[in-house]
């Protein structure tokens, strides 16, 4: 099978030549130095960039035939939410205090409190009540030591999941009591849909080697599917189907909150306050996100790369959606802006390496990034000059903003992430150009870097660390040496991408992705078998991340760990039904509308 796939790859490796574009020669570059009047790192502008026009090049170049941008500048600038924000903020503040009192009530039964915390979390309000939730969970742990009422599968599984999600060390052995004499899970649980669903969700918080949780997952999936076949309540069936498609732990939580807002039914009358707060908060945070998106669309349009280079993806909206997925909470605006800018450039430069550039040109560009010297532009072809200057200016500006706001000297870490990224891009280009299929382990080692994850996580780390003393050597080593939580998140990013994009890459003549490498190395393996092995690898990386999040030796800031985990989640989301970045489909468009365009329907007259 691998041989046949390689033959197919060779047939497709020389696509029909398509016209492409280049730019007329321009030598008018101006360098801005750091000074009291201009206190930024070296920044270079192109004095005549507005004079560049697209012209057809006679030399043949490949094209990925990306679909046009769905969201133009005028549309993004027209986004306007008519919320009466001041009035809504007043109401939200009052509701927030009432919900806080609900969480902190000492007479609430443990299960009711756990369900309330789960609702708060699923409705996207964790960031408002983080300290209250931790305190409540600590009290539940203490209570649990004295009251061994653990016969309820739903209560046990929900407690286990929430505790692990929030960094508590809790043993998988809490599920031993639900086993029968033969060592399997008791048959009496087969009809407990609520308990099975909670057990299923809890099983995705497992660590490597926790076989009991693997058994729990298999058992719960089997009997949840059986219950669906036999027929259960329509609303419950919808929840079960939704969970079986992708567990909550791996879902994009901001998007999940929007889904849950439509489904939530308060368990008690006073929980209506929680729903009301969640609706208001969703819309107010959406307004903030829209304003950020408009600012970034002006930056993107002014930079002009997507309009000048017709072979690249013009995907600002999708890139901002990714940044929002990594850092959704309102206080992380600077992080979202930095990630959007870095990822926007990643998509452009990735297309230069994957689609357009010759090997000689790509080597020159890689050398220029390695030097990080503006004079290196003299060695580059015109289209690469714009790419390099855009990268040089944006990274320097991002570094300057972080230095100004947080006092972190971070430029060397940001530039290192780009040096490593471009070298990984170049390696893939060499493999593809020479029709080499690397060993799977060698491919994955390089591909986890070429995922671009570190280029996104590096500015994220410095953006969320509030003070210079928050910077730890351990965290910096994770970024520079590429290990632990950072590596796992990047591997998941890459494998999710490969599962979705391998067919299109094969059509372009590329032979370097994980599916092809795995099939080539394991002769006789079918494509579906290779895909299943990649899914197992993704699951293994999730278990590593789960372990590190509760490890006493972890010195990474909690906010950064959540952002790294969120990068894995947004990878699942973006590539769940296909290539949501390269070829956005209806699902991608609908998700963007839910989070960034359409507010949740509320009656504002209630708050006037």
Curated annotation (Swiss-Prot):
Domain of life: Eukaryota
Cell compartments where the protein resides: Plastid, Chloroplast
UniProt: Mg(2+) 2 binding residues: 350, 354
UniProt keyword list: Chloroplast, Lyase, Magnesium, Metal-binding, Plastid, Transit peptide
Cofactor(s) required, per the database record: Mg(2+); Mn(2+)
Sequence positions that bind Mg(2+) 1: 350, 354
Name this protein carries in UniProt: Isoprene synthase, chloroplastic
Top-level EC class: lyase
Note on how the cofactor is bound: Binds 3 Mg(2+) or Mn(2+) ions per subunit.
Family membership noted in the UniProt record: Belongs to the terpene synthase family. Tpsb subfamily.
Presequence range in chain numbering: 1-45
GO biological process: diterpenoid biosynthetic process
Substrates-to-products reaction catalysed: dimethylallyl diphosphate = isoprene + diphosphate
GO cellular component terms, semicolon-separated: chloroplast
Classification via CDD domains: Terpene_cyclase_plant_C1
UniProt cross-references to SUPFAM superfamilies, sorted A to Z: Terpenoid cyclases/Protein prenyltransferases, Terpenoid synthases
Species of origin: Pueraria montana var. lobata (Kudzu vine)
Domain notes: The Asp-Asp-Xaa-Xaa-Asp/Glu (DDXXD/E) motif is important for the catalytic activity, presumably through binding to Mg(2+).
Other known facts: Sufficient to confer the trait of isoprene emission when expressed in Arabidopsis.
UniProt EC number: 4.2.3.27
Residues annotated for Mg(2+) 3 binding in this entry: 497, 501, 505
UniProt binding sites for dimethylallyl diphosphate: 350, 428, 494, 497
